[in-house]
Swiss-Prot record:
GO terms for molecular function: rRNA binding; structural constituent of ribosome. SUPFAM superfamilies: Ribosomal proteins S24e, L23 and L15e. It comes from Methanothermobacter thermautotrophicus (strain ATCC 29096 / DSM 1053 / JCM 10044 / NBRC 100330 / Delta H) (Methanobacterium thermoautotrophicum). Part of the 50S ribosomal subunit. Contacts protein L29. Binds to 23S rRNA. One of the proteins that surrounds the polypeptide exit tunnel on the outside of the ribosome. This is Large ribosomal subunit protein uL23. GO terms for cellular component: ribonucleoprotein complex; ribosome. It comes from the Archaea.
Amino acid sequence: MDPYAVIMKPHVTEKSMNLIDQNNELAFVVMRKSTKKDVRRAFEELFAVKVERVNTQVTPRGQKIAYIKLAKEHSAEDIAVKLGVF
């Protein structure tokens, strides 16, 4: 799958901002059909970082949100700044 098709946009909420600071974790809205492996591959390819784990959640509105935890050697804050989240 095309990485740009899998990862659609950052999911910016109060909870996701706390996850960036406390857990080195980012939240993204992803394509509904994508799997955790698809999200991991796409994120590692787009941002050149190592992903520790991916958790997904489908909201009542039908959006799929992926919570992506980065390895300790990479900073979620740096990626958030590059994306303009902060």
